[in-house]
């Protein structure tokens, strides 16, 4: 046992010596000393001074004014008595007032159209012409007048142009012709209003130049152009009106008698009630 322990100790010592030699060969001792010196120097060195903290500027969250004018006084939220609001009167539009529109009867419309065709037949056939009966959408109720398609294809320009409308008094007006839509647009409504066109009127357009229409207006309510047949009818109507007046007078007298009898009965009934009381 003693010999074994000595041999083990001897082996350990031999190993330690070998390790020291190797460390010497590798200069590990010097490296360890240099590390110790560096660590001691770093611990003994003075710490670097801390950088001074800069003061932060407080942020202003108020609204930035970009106007050069002086700022007005702050708003006041005090409660004051409110004055009653005045309602503005509504502006009545003649164009939208459908109740005031007057529509021509079929007989009057056909009568005006027949007179317009007679006038058209008397015009110079060298220049093209057509007759157009007026509707509400053609006059005050709208701003557009469609022209006959065959007439437009045969005689009207192929592009948009400004047409001149010359009335019977040689007064000129301007209206824009739209080639793709075959009608008059800008300026037609003003012409219709200025010449007081209404539903049922018949208008004759005579193309006296490439961009000029001579316009003849036949009024639906023009009594001066009525024929003699109309006068005879009026005479017959006058006789019938006299008979109607006589009948009305008799009926009025009967109504007066019945009213007077009713008043007498009421007065007698009131007297009886007073006597009972």
Swiss-Prot record:
GO cellular component, one term: nucleus
The keyword Ribosomal protein belongs to this UniProt entry's keyword annotation: no
Superkingdom as given in the UniProt entry: Eukaryota
CDD domains for this protein: B3_DNA
DNA-binding region coordinates: 130-221
UniProtKB keywords: DNA-binding, Nucleus, Transcription, Transcription regulation
UniProt KW Transcription regulation keyword: yes
Chain intervals with Acidic residues compositional bias: 224-250
InterPro entries hit by this protein: B3_DNA-bd, DNA-bd_pseudobarrel_sf, REM16-like
Listed Basic and acidic residues bias regions: 251-264
Name of this chain's protein: B3 domain-containing protein At3g19184
Organism annotation: Arabidopsis thaliana (Mouse-ear cress)
């Amino acid at each position: 046992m003693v010999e074994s322990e000595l041999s083990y100790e001897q082996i350990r010592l031999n190993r330690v010596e070998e390790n020291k030699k190797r460390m010497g060969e590798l200069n590990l001792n010097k490296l360890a000393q240099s590390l110790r010196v560096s660590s001691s120097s770093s611990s003994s060195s003075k710490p670097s001074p801390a950088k001074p903290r800069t003061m932060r500027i407080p942020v202003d969250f108020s609204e930035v004014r970009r106007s050069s004018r002086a700022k007005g006084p702050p708003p006041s939220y005090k409660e004051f008595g409110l004055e009653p609001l005045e309602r503005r009167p509504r502006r009545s539009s003649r164009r939208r007032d459908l109740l005031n529109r007057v529509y021509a009867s079929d007989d009057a419309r056909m009568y005006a159209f027949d007179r317009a065709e007679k006038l058209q037949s008397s015009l110079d056939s060298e220049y093209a012409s057509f007759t157009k009966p007026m509707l509400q959408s053609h006059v005050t109720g709208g701003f557009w007048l469609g022209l006959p398609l065959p007439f437009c294809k045969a005689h009207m320009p192929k592009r948009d142009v400004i047409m001149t409308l010359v009335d019977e008094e040689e007064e000129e007006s301007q209206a824009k012709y739209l080639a793709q839509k075959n009608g008059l647009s800008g300026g037609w409504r003003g012409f219709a209003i200025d010449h007081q066109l209404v539903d049922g009127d018949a208008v004759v357009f005579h193309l006296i130049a490439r961009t000029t229409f001579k316009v003849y207006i036949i009024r639906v309510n023009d009594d001066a152009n009525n024929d003699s047949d109309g006068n005879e009818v009026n005479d017959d109507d006058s006789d019938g009106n006299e008979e109607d007046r006589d009948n009305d007078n008799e009926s009025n007298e009967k109504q007066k008698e019945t009213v007077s009898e009713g008043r007498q009965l009421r007065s007698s009934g009131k007297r009886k009630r007073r006597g009972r009381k």
